[in-house]
């Protein structure tokens, strides 16, 4: 309707267009008094431009791995529609799109309104590696070999058991342990313990092939298998955990662990992931949580929300506060696993899909979980947390806001530590801002008896905190690690991995790629900075030497030739 009503004076208005339709608009008015006529006129000008759909697409620039995300507003015929769109902080902070003077606060922060038919924004890609490299002189070889041997000598019968010795047969805890074994296997192989690495890979093959088969000895199984449910368009793994059946919750977490373990198998035995072996089953798991728009079996990007740029955990989302998401690191693991699998199998489409999901997960972690602009006092409108929020971070994002909590504990070590599990080179996004990380670690350890991981009580993830601390101050993490003679690893972590992680970060320094300042043209390439000295790490999944370039802005700062099937560190 062309009628305009002031809601403060109300009044009666008729619908006077031929369609007998009207558009109701909540105007973004933040101050007391009447809404300005200029605001009313601007919104009225687009009020009858009917938007039937918003198409969200991504593209990866292979020259610098920058990801561009485009929101397009279309009518029922698919033609572009001029409208006034609300741009969330992730959008307007990373776009060149001009906005109107009108804005409003939301659960995510300031929404700015813009006249447009589409907008695009750019986010940096963080990068992944199959494991951290083993660099001569960065650790004691005998110590690391001993920790790998200790893990192997436990026996494979305990690799997928709880601390009490109970065997796991659900998708979450089994997947978590498969990821752990994949990490130890990769470390073992990197230091020449090939026999031990192969033993772990053989165990992973047996475990995953068991899950990927519905029968045992000609009889249908009741545990450790997947089935497709056509009513709900989903793949269900038996046994379920944490509502993965009843609520279709956390599929990206659970199945991402399986894909991560499978990707390590593919890295060392590509034939096992062939289309005539287990490749189709691995890709079916990926499709369940990261399907294309036109997938006939699964919803588009089940857990990932392209509009917000991050993932939601729950499938039912019938909470009063809407949906929620806790661990960005488990989401990043799921999406990073797609990248590793895509690189190992030379599947560019999957690799770039994983890069988009992984980059967006990292960008939104810093935008919404850590409110990095608020932390840096950029401006009032850039501060996404509501006035009076007492912390520099949050653990749970809800539809209506944030919550400094976890689902299982009120301990600060858990509330902040959950963003550091599982610890692997798929979660580098958590360590991007080393200065911020100092305050993050201090807050997470503020309830420790000595403000260090060694002072945490049992089951508060000492090892994960050493790993997080190493991303900002590796020498301090190592010193505290060396003060502890015995500890129980977090369920998805191993002593070999922790030792390797903290000493490798001590050698390499802080992450230097991932914020957009330094970029590279390879998905498995990372730059580090230690006291102003750069190190460049590349893993080449192919059988050919490949050139890799690192840039600062448009200036090339390093080029290297990455050797086939392995790490190159310069």
Q: Which role fits each region the language model picked out?
A:
Residues 1-252, 292-310, 314-315, 342-345, ...:
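Ser/Thr/Asn(+Pro)-rich, low-complexity disordered segments
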Residues 168-189, 204, 245-274, 278-282, ...:
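Aromatic-rich carbohydrate-recognition surfaces in CAZymes
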Residues 258, 285, 350, 354-357:
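Alpha-helical solenoid repeat scaffolds, predominantly canonical TPR units
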Residues 271-274, 347-351:
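Acidic, serine/threonine/proline-rich low-complexity intrinsically disordered regions
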Residues 273-283, 287-303, 340:
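Alpha-helical scaffolds that organize eukaryotic protein assemblies
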Residues 319, 324, 329-343, 351:
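Alpha-helical transmembrane segments
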